[in-house]
Amino acid sequence: MDKRDLEQLLSNVADGSVAPADALTRIQTAPTADLGFAQLDLSRGVRQGAGEVIYGAGKTAEQIAAIIEALRDAGQEHVLVTRLDADKAARTAELLAGNIDLGYVPNAQLALVGGMPSPTGNGRIVVACAGTSDLPVAEEAALTAEFYGNEVDRLYDVGVAGLHRLLAHAEELAQAQVVIAIAGMEGALASVIGGLVSCPVIAVPTSVGYGASFGGVAALLAMLNSCASGVSVVNIDNGFGAAYQASLINHLSAGAPCAR
């Protein structure tokens, strides 16, 4: 159960569609569920505002399906699965068929249960990537941000090799609440954007590039050493982590505790 699930449950109690005793039973669900191969954190959504996310790499389709079912049984209506390849997604969907609908986005390797919510953020998140080869990471970031209730503008293939492509979107950048800047090779895009905007920039180095890019390490070090003051950096290819952080920022209220 996450914050939006809890709000909906309380709303249902208020309008009489759910009995208070039934609501209490759902809220008092044990904070963990032991599946043998996984210990699910069922209270994370109440503590942090967003429920547990499933990292699909390294898990079997059977394990992923079992986790999804357990999360749903505990009241978490929306579930996100990252790093899920197409074959495993198809098998997971078969296991859930007739019970839970699994939406899959191949180019982002993301699976969604419960669909996309209406936007609730303070402003817009811009996801900008340097090249078409960065699109899988960019789409992971963009879809994750939308999953957490944010409006997203996509600026793709706007790398520094053709700076005019980025500058053509100066208005969108100026209106952003947060920018996620994604680039491989030398990773210069984040610093350039950081020098153009007044909002936080979250840089994502990607593993795109030739030999001396060292699988994204060159871009990572360049972004960490950015001279633009508002740039922070997440791990290589971590579009999900960047989007989660951007969503937290976009849902902050002045003087309010951090909550989504």
Task: Annotate the PLM regions.
Residues 62-64, 134-139, 163-164, 183-192, ...:
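Short glycine/serine/threonine-rich phosphate/pyrophosphate-binding segments
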Residues 101-105, 193-216:
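Short, acidic/small-residue loops that bind anionic groups at enzyme active sites
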Residues 108-114, 151-172, 217-218, 234:
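Glycine-rich oxoanion-binding loops at beta->alpha junctions
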